[in-house]
Amino acid sequence: MDLGEKINTVERLVIDASRVSRYLGYPRKVPIWKLEFNLPKTCYIFRENNNSDIAIDIENMMGFAIVPALSEKEAHNRLKTLIPSIYIKDKIERL
């Protein structure tokens, strides 16, 4: 099993999304969701092709993610595959 990359969530970490153009094109536009979350001091991130379109910003064990997904539940599940140890702290917002 791949352990992913260990990150220190106290320091600032910004990961930009890639491959976003496939979600923004006509005829079907995928909704974009903003999720705010808390993290432990150190955790693992599992960046792969199927979640490289997720952007995250982390600092002081808190952060937010911008996730393209068809539903709120799918957005939550996609973020959990990227960072399994997250705790969603607020309502998920559709942008």
Where are these regions (language model features)?
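A short, exposed loop/beta-hairpin motif centered on an aromatic-Gly-Thr core
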Residues: 49-50, 54-73
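A structural detector for beta-sheet-dominated domains
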Residues: 36-38, 59, 70, 93
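Hydrophobic beta-strand residues in large extracellular and virion-surface proteins
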Residues: 33-35, 45, 67-69, 75, ...
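Short glycine-aromatic motifs
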Residues: 43, 54, 86-87
